Amino acid sequence: MADYLTVTHLTKYLKLKFDRDPYLERVYLTGQVSNFRKRPTHQYFSLKDESAVIQATMWAGVYKKLGFDLEEGMKINVIGRVQLYEPSGSYSIVIEKAEPDGIGALALQFEQLKKKLTAEGYFEQKHKQPLPQFVSKIGVITSPSGAVIRDIITTVSRRFPGVEILLFPTKVQGDGAAQEVVANIRRANQREDLDLLIVGRGGGSIEDLWAFNEEIVVQAIFESQLPVISSVGHETDTTLADFVADRRAATPTAAAELATPITKTDLMSWIVERQNRSYQACLRRIKQRQEWVDKLSQSVIFRQPERLYDAYLQKIDRLSMTLMNTMKDRLSSAKENKVQLDHALANSQLQTKIERYQDRVATAKRLLMANMASQYDSQLARFEKAQDALLSLDASRIIARGYAMIEKNQALVASVSQITKGDQLTIKMRDGQLDVEVKDVKNENI
């Protein structure tokens, strides 16, 4: 009679076979991801091809180290071990390592992170800072032993001697490189003497350049208050640091040129040109002023200053005559009124009427005299004010204060440009005049 096995016994036997079979302990498998839904810890999904499906498990630590995200329909190559799950009698593969089929894991991770950061706006042009035209100190984050720092120093020294280079020695590949780049970007931003940053390294494989594709480096460059120039790898290499930086340079030399857009020679030429323009503008202004002074010195006021107050004297004479005539007319009118009043009073029999008329005459006389005195004082004050203003322009009074007046051929001399050697001049002073001959002429500004 045959012995019948229980389901449990059969399952345990099969599990023992699975666990001890060397071919199932390390399986290399390719398949398409199916039924994938990202979980916060371990990942459970299926791998399938055209004819079969196998369940797959990936522990949280393994998934975290992948460097890329699994997606529904993605074809991957995995390494793992096959195990049997006794309660259900089903088998599955526990994945220990995985990479995309046909494309490197880093390349896929690059594209996925680029897509994510683009959607979050990290690479938008509106976040780019303009580079300064003139710098005094440049921070460089790179390896101290590479050709990058040498090329930058050489180019900056050639284009603008005197600009300082501050090197932040940084590990640029391998474990911890991304963290060092981030730390030095933040250190540089704490300084107040830097104008911009150059972040870069020489060429290499995608693995060598990977520190500059890390999200923490992209975040640090994005948050930098200093403008950042990225110069990572060769011209054909592209990193996420290039996308987020304010400017990307294909080579260290190009980065140094971007950092010094205007050379010292260009600046000196511009300064000389501005100086020449300012000098010519000053000469034109001086010439215009000299022409104005020459023209003014030939005007009637300076050649015949007495004509300046002729009109005022005539006006004063007219006002004086008017005042005198007015006073005479009013006195004459007052006398006539007095005669009429005296005649009327002589014919009056009433003493009270005489006294009333006498009071009116006295009042009228007082008002007349007060009015005449007020007008006389007002006209006299205006006359004296005008006379003082005119006398202040009198050349003889200017000479009396200690100045001298120079004449050539009875014409006033206002500038040395009117005099030549050998000219006969007359110098008028307050107590006499001098007749002199010019022996030399010197042009000097006072």
Swiss-Prot record:
<dbReference type="InterPro" id="IPR025824">
    <property type="entry name" value="OB-fold_nuc-bd_dom"/>
</dbReference>
<comment type="similarity">
    <text>Belongs to the XseA family.</text>
</comment>
<dbReference type="GO" id="GO:0003676">
    <property type="term" value="F:nucleic acid binding"/>
</dbReference>
<dbReference type="GO" id="GO:0005737">
    <property type="term" value="C:cytoplasm"/>
</dbReference>
<protein>
    <recommendedName>
        <fullName>Exodeoxyribonuclease 7 large subunit</fullName>
        <ecNumber>3.1.11.6</ecNumber>
    </recommendedName>
</protein>
<keyword id="KW-0540">Nuclease</keyword>
<keyword id="KW-0269">Exonuclease</keyword>
<comment type="subunit">
    <text>Heterooligomer composed of large and small subunits.</text>
</comment>
<dbReference type="Pfam" id="PF13742">
    <property type="entry name" value="tRNA_anti_2"/>
</dbReference>
<dbReference type="GO" id="GO:0006308">
    <property type="term" value="P:DNA catabolic process"/>
</dbReference>
<dbReference type="GO" id="GO:0008855">
    <property type="term" value="F:exodeoxyribonuclease VII activity"/>
</dbReference>
<comment type="function">
    <text>Bidirectionally degrades single-stranded DNA into large acid-insoluble oligonucleotides, which are then degraded further into small acid-soluble oligonucleotides.</text>
</comment>
<dbReference type="InterPro" id="IPR003753">
    <property type="entry name" value="Exonuc_VII_L"/>
</dbReference>
<dbReference type="Pfam" id="PF02601">
    <property type="entry name" value="Exonuc_VII_L"/>
</dbReference>
<keyword id="KW-0963">Cytoplasm</keyword>
<dbReference type="InterPro" id="IPR020579">
    <property type="entry name" value="Exonuc_VII_lsu_C"/>
</dbReference>
<keyword id="KW-0378">Hydrolase</keyword>
<dbReference type="GO" id="GO:0009318">
    <property type="term" value="C:exodeoxyribonuclease VII complex"/>
</dbReference>
